[in-house]
Amino acid sequence: MSAANDGAAPAASAAPGMSAAPEWSAAERATLRAAFRAGRLPHALLIHEAPGAGGEWLATWAAQLVLCREPARAPCGACTGCRRVWALQHPDVTWLRATEESRQIRIEQVRDLAAELALTAHGGGYKVGIVSPADALNRFAANALLKTLEEPPPGTLLVLTATQPSRLPATLISRCQRLRVRAPTRAEGIAWLTALRGTGEWGEALEVLGDAPLLLARAEPREIAQTGLDARRTLDALAEGTADPVAEAERWARGEALPLRLRCFENWLTDQIRRRTPSPTPITEVRAGPYLPAGGVVLNIRELFGLLDEVRELRATLDVPLNRGLALEALFRRLTRQGAPS
C-alpha cells in the first residue's frame, strides 16, 4: 500500500468493519460485481455517501474486488490480496487524503498518485487509487486529477468518495460513474453495529451522530450517547433562554469533545429545520422564510440555515488556530435570540 499524502500512511480506520457488510449498500456492491465480471467496470467511480454511511468501506471493497486472488468469488475477503487491502498494506493501492496542515488534498499529492498509477502493478493486475474525501481536493488538485481521469493508464481503477460532490468540478464528475450510498435506517445501523461489535447503546449513539454507523465502528457508544444528551439539553436551554451563552460556550470549548458536540449541534439544527417545515421536503430544498410552529413563535428558517452553515464551517476549521470560545459564544447568542421551542 502506498499513500500520496506527504509520506504519511492513511489512518487505520480507513475501512472499519470490513468483516460486516452494510446491508444498505448491497445493491451498489452487486452492481460493481456484475460490471467487473462482465468486463465493464469503469475506470473511475464517484461514491456519493451520506456522512458515516460507508463510502470508504465501499471504496475499499471495490479495491478488494479487482485485487482478489479468487476471481470466481471476488472479493472473497480471505485471500492475500483481500487481506492486504483490508489491512491497508497492498502495494497496488494508493490512498489520497487531506493533509493535516491544510485539510486539503493538494496538487503535489495528485501528481504523486498519477506517477504511482503509471507504474506496473506488483501483482500484474489492477492499480487502484482511492481519493477520500474527494471534496477536499483544492482547485488545482481537482484540475490535475481531471487529466488522469481523461487519460487513465491501462488497468487502473480510481475511486472517489464525497459527501458533498457539488463541490467538485462538473467536468471531473462527468468522468466518473456515480454510486449513491444512502444513509441507513436506525434499525439497519443498530443491526450492523451489533454484528460487528456486539450489543451496546447503539440506538442512542446513532441518534447523536445522525445515523452514521461507520463513525461508531471503533467508538464507545455510551460516552457518545451521554455527550449527545448533554449537548441537546444545552441547545434546548439556549433556545428557551434559560442558559447562559457565555458560560456554555466556555464549557464547550474546553476538552476534547468539541468535534462531537458540534456534530450534535449540526444534527439539532437540521432537526429543528425539518420539524418547522410544513411538508416532508428534503432539507436541501426547504425555502428560507418564516414558519409558524406549534409553539406560536415565528421562526425564521433562513436564520436556522445560517446557523447550520456556520456550525459546519466551524467544524471544518477546528484545526485552524482561533478562539473557539468566542466563535461558540456568537453562535449561542444568535440561537438564544432566535429561539427554537419544541
Which residues are covered by each model-predicted region?
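AAA+/P-loop NTPase substrate/partner-engagement loops
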Residues: 75-105, 166
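Conserved alpha-helical scaffold flanking the Walker A/P-loop in AAA+ ATPase domains
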Residues: 30-36, 106-128, 136, 140-148
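Flexible beta-alpha connector loops of hexameric P-loop NTPases
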Residues: 99-107, 134, 178
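Short loop/turn elements that form and flank the Walker-type P-loop nucleotide-binding site
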Residues: 40-41, 86-91, 122-125, 152-155
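ATP/adenylate-binding site constellation spanning eukaryotic-like Ser/Thr protein kinases
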Residues: 90, 110, 142, 173, ...
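Structural recognition of the conserved hydrophobic beta-strand(s) that form the central parallel beta-sheet
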Residues: 129-132, 145, 156-162
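Charged, glycine-rich active-site and insertion segments that engage polyanionic ligands
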Residues: 1-65, 73, 81-84, 154-157, ...
